Amino acid sequence: MANYVYTIFLDAGHGGSDPGAVYKGRQEKDDTLALTLAVGEILESYGFRVIYSRTEDIYESPYQKAAKANASGAD
């Protein structure tokens, strides 16, 4: 039986100048990044290859993220 390794592309959403929803100083961009990194870590521990749209507080347009995802070779 073949041992398949899957590549997963995770998009944290928002970032940089786009905070997403904001409530009492809490910004959605921070929550989405933390959650994406945590999920990615779990997936990596199971042997998946994970590619992230961002790992720090930067902004990329939806078009840029889609192009990055399409070029990543993710399954």
Predicted regions and their residues:
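Catalytic-core regions of hydrolytic enzymes
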Residues: 2-75
